[in-house]
């Protein structure tokens, strides 16, 4: 089986040798190129999510949605981003300029870092850490601090209240999220995202953790929506209550960065759902898998399939994640916003006991299996 990542790396190293570039410099160039490709790809993914949300929302409300900016309005998000980039950046007169500027950066940067441990294919990952899933939880917990800093630096009561809500919401739902991830790690025997996907692929479609951990999947789904501050859990920026929450005093590109961070977090969350519960890059779907086995009997076709394998893996991962995103977007128009007390009760009195009970059941099953 061809390892395409190693193949490309070896080709580049051979090219660097011909150009008499040192090994350390060539490795630095490879890391920079891989990171740049990931950032560009993730940014394009965010633009697609924004367009998809607008189109799905328009369909739910019997509207047309984006139409004029490109075919089917596909570049409307890019046009809006350029518009925000050209707008004036206003700083509140009595606000803290340093904290006001640091808020958007603290929100966006950690979310980009979490993509380091997301496997888009068997060998398509920037950093296969042994603690990949907990690295994601640890890094993503920094984001509410940025929202709190942004609200405090704005010197606005609505902004500060939105930041406090974001911090309370994150603390409430990170614990059930971590317990669900720990249950998956117990089943897989590893905290590595690659190992978790490979454990599921051993048993095909029915080996996905979605079937083995249905309770954990539901708890993870609700917790991830709350972590991403999606409706019905968008209390930190509730327009009817807090004007625009922590974004009230922001304008221009800083205002746009909050939305970029929100959609980056949503995409990362959907990718982790795919990795943890939906088999990752594994294409073990009934009927389609059998057809692929019949076609691959030819040696020529088999070699072609080996060459195309990384593309198929990336396409499979993204297809599953956008399929999950479709249901996340639908919740925006089907469920009403909850109150703050209902939000905290749901996290502490419902999801936490369920996630803890699911962890105990998983641990008991694991002990019985080993014994």
Curated annotation (Swiss-Prot):
<feature type="transmembrane region" description="Helical">
    <location>
        <begin position="350"/>
        <end position="370"/>
    </location>
</feature>
<keyword id="KW-0934">Plastid</keyword>
<feature type="transmembrane region" description="Helical">
    <location>
        <begin position="98"/>
        <end position="118"/>
    </location>
</feature>
<dbReference type="InterPro" id="IPR001694">
    <property type="entry name" value="NADH_UbQ_OxRdtase_su1/FPO"/>
</dbReference>
<comment type="function">
    <text>NDH shuttles electrons from NAD(P)H:plastoquinone, via FMN and iron-sulfur (Fe-S) centers, to quinones in the photosynthetic chain and possibly in a chloroplast respiratory chain. The immediate electron acceptor for the enzyme in this species is believed to be plastoquinone. Couples the redox reaction to proton translocation, and thus conserves the redox energy in a proton gradient.</text>
</comment>
<dbReference type="GO" id="GO:0003954">
    <property type="term" value="F:NADH dehydrogenase activity"/>
</dbReference>
<keyword id="KW-0150">Chloroplast</keyword>
<comment type="subunit">
    <text>NDH is composed of at least 16 different subunits, 5 of which are encoded in the nucleus.</text>
</comment>
<feature type="transmembrane region" description="Helical">
    <location>
        <begin position="310"/>
        <end position="330"/>
    </location>
</feature>
<keyword id="KW-0618">Plastoquinone</keyword>
<dbReference type="Pfam" id="PF00146">
    <property type="entry name" value="NADHdh"/>
</dbReference>
<dbReference type="GO" id="GO:0009535">
    <property type="term" value="C:chloroplast thylakoid membrane"/>
</dbReference>
<dbReference type="GO" id="GO:0019684">
    <property type="term" value="P:photosynthesis, light reaction"/>
</dbReference>
<dbReference type="GO" id="GO:0048038">
    <property type="term" value="F:quinone binding"/>
</dbReference>
<keyword id="KW-1278">Translocase</keyword>
<comment type="similarity">
    <text>Belongs to the complex I subunit 1 family.</text>
</comment>
<keyword id="KW-1133">Transmembrane helix</keyword>
<feature type="transmembrane region" description="Helical">
    <location>
        <begin position="129"/>
        <end position="149"/>
    </location>
</feature>
<protein>
    <recommendedName>
        <fullName>NAD(P)H-quinone oxidoreductase subunit 1, chloroplastic</fullName>
        <ecNumber>7.1.1.-</ecNumber>
    </recommendedName>
</protein>
<keyword id="KW-0874">Quinone</keyword>
<keyword id="KW-0812">Transmembrane</keyword>
<feature type="transmembrane region" description="Helical">
    <location>
        <begin position="177"/>
        <end position="197"/>
    </location>
</feature>
<keyword id="KW-0472">Membrane</keyword>
<feature type="transmembrane region" description="Helical">
    <location>
        <begin position="255"/>
        <end position="275"/>
    </location>
</feature>
<feature type="transmembrane region" description="Helical">
    <location>
        <begin position="29"/>
        <end position="49"/>
    </location>
</feature>
<feature type="transmembrane region" description="Helical">
    <location>
        <begin position="205"/>
        <end position="225"/>
    </location>
</feature>
<dbReference type="GO" id="GO:0009060">
    <property type="term" value="P:aerobic respiration"/>
</dbReference>
<keyword id="KW-0520">NAD</keyword>
<keyword id="KW-0793">Thylakoid</keyword>
<dbReference type="InterPro" id="IPR018086">
    <property type="entry name" value="NADH_UbQ_OxRdtase_su1_CS"/>
</dbReference>
<dbReference type="GO" id="GO:0016655">
    <property type="term" value="F:oxidoreductase activity, acting on NAD(P)H, quinone or similar compound as acceptor"/>
</dbReference>
<keyword id="KW-0521">NADP</keyword>
């Amino acid at each position: 089986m061809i390892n395409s990542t190693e193949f490309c790396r070896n080709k580049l190293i051979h090219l660097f040798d011909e150009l008499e570039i040192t090994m350390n410099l060539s490795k630095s160039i490879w890391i920079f190129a891989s990171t740049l490709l990931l950032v560009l790809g993730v940014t394009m993914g965010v633009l697609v999510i924004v367009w998809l949300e607008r189109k799905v929302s328009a369909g739910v409300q019997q509207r047309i949605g984006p139409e004029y900016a490109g075919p089917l309005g596909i570049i409307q998000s890019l046009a809006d981003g350029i518009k925000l980039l050209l707008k004036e950046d206003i700083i509140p007169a009595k606000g803290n300029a340093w904290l006001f500027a640091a808020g958007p950066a603290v929100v966006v940067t950690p979310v980009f870092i979490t993509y380091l441990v997301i496997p888009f294919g068997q060998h398509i990952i920037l950093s296969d850490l042994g603690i990949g899933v907990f690295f994601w939880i640890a890094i993503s917990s920094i984001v509410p601090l940025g929202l709190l800093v942004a609200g405090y630096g704005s010197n606005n009561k609505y902004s500060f209240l939105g930041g406090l809500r974001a911090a309370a919401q994150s603390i409430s739902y990170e614990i059930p999220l971590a317990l669900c991830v720990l249950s998956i790690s117990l089943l897989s025997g590893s905290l590595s995202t690659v190992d978790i996907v490979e454990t599921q692929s051993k048993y095909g479609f029915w080996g996905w953790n979605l079937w083995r951990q249905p309770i954990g999947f539901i708890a993870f789904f609700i917790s991830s929506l709350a972590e991403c501050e999606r409706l019905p859990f968008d209390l930190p920026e509730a327009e009817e209550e807090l004007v625009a929450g922590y974004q009230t005093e922001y304008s221009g590109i800083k205002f746009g960065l909050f939305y970029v961070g929100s959609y980056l977090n949503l995409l990362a969350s959907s990718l982790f759902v795919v990795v943890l519960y939906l088999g990752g890059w594994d294409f073990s779907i009934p009927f389609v898998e059998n057809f692929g086995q019949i076609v691959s009997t030819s040696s020529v076709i088999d070699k072609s399939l080996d060459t195309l394998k990384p593309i198929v893996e990336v396409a499979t991962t993204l297809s599953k994640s956008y399929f999950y995103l479709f249901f996340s977007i639908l919740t925006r128009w089907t469920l009403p916003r909850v109150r703050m007390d209902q939000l905290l009760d749901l996290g502490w009195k419902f999801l936490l006991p369920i996630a803890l009970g699911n962890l105990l059941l998983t641990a008991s099953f694991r002990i019985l299996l080993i014994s």
